[in-house]
């Protein structure tokens, strides 16, 4: 006799984004040899980055453990949403509203926290500079942060977007998996033809690559979805995407910004 095995929405909401992170990163690792679509060459990646890939993996795993613990606590405190799911009929419009609300909340939280970590010299030196050891970003380095930064920016930001939007644990499975894919894509270091994220969002791998360069650290703080706060508050750095002579692409800021 076969025994049923039920997996709760809360468990999936905790585990799915972590699994999605490594699966989607793995796709970009497989594509990283495509020099004609890279924003930096492999040589630049090896020479400019200030941290080993093994250290990056360890750092990401630490953050994901913290992320999982906070998610479990959050679901425990808010309680099971099973009864609410039965009582409430979710329409597409309700789900769309929750997604958009969560996206705006997450973007707002991350913009101001991210910008403050650049402006506060102590926080930048001791915490945020760890992420900027990756001058040439790559996919699975997206969540390579100091544990304190991971908690403040990503984990607490995610919890706020969950609570403010009013989404259920089941909806959160899809939202946080989507947010994870978007974050990985922004750090992938590739500009691939037909990438839907590049078509829909101005905040993309080229946009975020600018921020990782020395001349861009005061600009392009927005992540992971929109660029509205950069535009509103004057931290938007315009750029053009140019073909490199040795193959691939380069995100080049306008001259007046690069000389700033």
UniProtKB/Swiss-Prot annotation:
UniProt domain Fatty acid hydroxylase: residue ranges: 99-235
BP terms from Gene Ontology: photomorphogenesis; sphingoid biosynthetic process
Main function: Involved in sphingolipid trihydroxy long-chain base (4-hydroxysphinganine) biosynthesis. Can use C18- and C20-sphinganine as substrates to produce C18- and C20-phytosphinganines (D-ribo-2-amino-1,3,4-trihydroxyoctadecane and -eicosane).
Parts of the chain that traverse the membrane: 11-31, 55-75, 92-112
Keyword Lipid biosynthesis applies: yes
One GO CC term, this protein: endoplasmic reticulum
Pfam families given in the database record: FA_hydroxylase (PF04116)
Subcellular location(s) of the protein: Endoplasmic reticulum membrane
Membrane topology of the entry: Multi-pass membrane protein
UniProt xrefs under InterPro entries: Fatty_acid_hydroxylase, Sterol_Desaturase_Related
GO MF annotations, alphabetized: iron ion binding; sphingolipid C4-monooxygenase activity
Motif Histidine box-1 per record, residues: 114-118
Name of this chain's protein: Sphinganine C4-monooxygenase 1
Motif Histidine box-3 mapped to chain: 207-213
């Amino acid at each position: 006799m076969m025994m049923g095995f039920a997996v709760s929405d809360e468990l999936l909401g905790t585990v799915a984004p972590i699994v999605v992170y490594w699966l989607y990163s793995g796709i970009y690792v497989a594509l990283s040899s495509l020099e004609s679509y890279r924003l930096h060459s492999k040589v630049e990646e090896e020479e400019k980055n200030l941290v080993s890939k093994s250290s990056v993996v360890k750092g990401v795993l630490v953050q994901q453990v913290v992320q999982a613990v906070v998610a479990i606590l959050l679901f425990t405190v808010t309680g099971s949403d099973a009864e609410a799911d039965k009582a409430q009929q979710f329409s597409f419009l309700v789900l769309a509203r929750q997604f958009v609300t969560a996206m705006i909340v997450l973007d707002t939280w991350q913009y101001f926290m991210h910008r403050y970590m650049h402006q506060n010299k102590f926080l930048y030196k001791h915490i945020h500079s760890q992420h900027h050891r990756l001058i040439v970003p790559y996919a699975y380095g997206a969540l390579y942060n100091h544990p304190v930064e991971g908690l403040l920016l990503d984990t607490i930001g995610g919890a706020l977007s969950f609570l403010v939007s009013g989404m259920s644990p089941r909806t959160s499975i899809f939202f946080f998996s989507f947010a994870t894919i978007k974050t990985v894509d922004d750090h992938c270091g590739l500009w691939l033809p037909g990438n839907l994220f590049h078509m829909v969002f101005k905040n993309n791998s080229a946009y975020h690559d600018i921020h990782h360069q020395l001349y861009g650290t005061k600009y392009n703080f927005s992540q992971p979805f929109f660029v509205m706060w950069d535009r509103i508050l004057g931290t938007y750095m315009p750029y053009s995407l140019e073909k490199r002579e040795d193959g691939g692409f380069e995100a080049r800021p306008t001259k007046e910004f690069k000389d700033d």
